[in-house]
C-alpha cells in the first residue's frame, strides 16, 4: 500500500470538466512553518519554474479551465487556472506536481504564474486512501461540495501562492494582489 499523499503518475480517464478546479481558503501558516515549510516551498518553486512560460505548461498537459476567477467583495482574485486532467484524475497529492497552475492575466495579454493549486476528487481520494483528509505542504486540503460554481462533484483543494505574495496568507483561496482585469474580465 502506498503512503497517503504519494503519487504514481498514471493517466486516468477523467471527465473534461473535472480536470481543473478550484479553491477555497484556509489559514494554517503556523502549522506550515512548524513543518519546515520553506524548504518544501523552494522545492515547489523549482518544480514549477518552467511553467512561467505558459507554452511549457501547455506542453506538459495543462490547459485553461473556467474563467479568471475574481471576487467582488474586495478579497482579490484566484486568477486563471490551468489544469492537468491526468493529475486531477490521480487521487494522490504530490507537492512537486500540482494539479493546477494559477496565472494572473496582464494588461499586455500575457499570463504571469502566481501560484499553484492542489486538487483531488473526493470519491477518488477516499477509494484510494480512505476518509483521512488529504494534506499538502503540511496543510489540510479544504473540502468543496458538489453544486459548486465549477459544476464538479465533491473535491478537495488548496491554493499555494508561491510566486506572488498574498496579504491574506500563503494558502488562502483569494489573493488581494491578483486581478483578472488584465484579460477584460470585470474586476
Residues covered by each model-derived region:
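Short, hydrophobic alpha-helical membrane anchors of single-pass surface/secreted proteins
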Residues: 12-16
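Primary mode marks residue(s) on the alpha4-beta5-alpha5 output face of response regulator receiver
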Residues: 34-187
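Sec/Tat signal peptide C-region and signal peptidase I cleavage site
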Residues: 29-33
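N-terminal secretory signal peptides that target proteins for export/translocation
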Residues: 1-11
Amino acid at each position: 500500500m502506498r503512503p497517503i499523499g504519494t503519487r504514481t503518475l498514471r493517466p486516468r480517464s477523467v471527465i473534461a470538466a473535472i480536470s481543473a478546479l478550484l479553491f477555497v481558503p484556509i489559514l494554517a501558516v503556523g502549522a506550515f512553518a512548524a513543518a519546515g515549510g520553506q524548504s518544501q516551498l523552494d522545492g515547489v518553486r523549482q518544480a514549477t519554474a518552467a511553467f512561467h512560460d505558459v507554452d511549457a505548461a501547455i506542453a506538459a498537459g495543462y490547459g485553461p479551465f473556467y474563467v479568471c476567477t475574481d471576487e467582488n467583495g474586495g478579497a482579490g482574485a484566484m486568477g486563471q487556472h490551468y489544469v492537468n486532467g491526468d493529475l486531477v484524475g490521480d487521487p494522490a497529492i504530490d507537492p512537486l506536481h500540482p494539479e493546477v497552475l494559477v496565472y494572473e492575466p496582464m494588461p499586455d495579454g500575457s499570463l504571469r504564474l502566481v501560484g499553484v493549486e492542489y486538487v483531488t476528487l473526493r470519491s477518488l481520494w477516499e477509494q484510494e486512501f480512505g476518509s483521512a483528509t488529504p494534506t499538502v505542504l503540511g496543510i489540510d486540503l479544504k473540502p468543496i461540495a458538489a453544486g459548486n460554481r465549477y459544476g464538479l462533484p465533491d473535491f478537495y483543494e488548496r491554493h499555494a501562492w508561491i510566486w506572488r505574495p498574498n496579504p491574506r496568507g500563503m494558502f488562502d483561496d483569494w489573493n488581494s494582489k491578483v486581478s483578472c482585469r488584465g484579460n477584460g474580465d470585470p474586476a
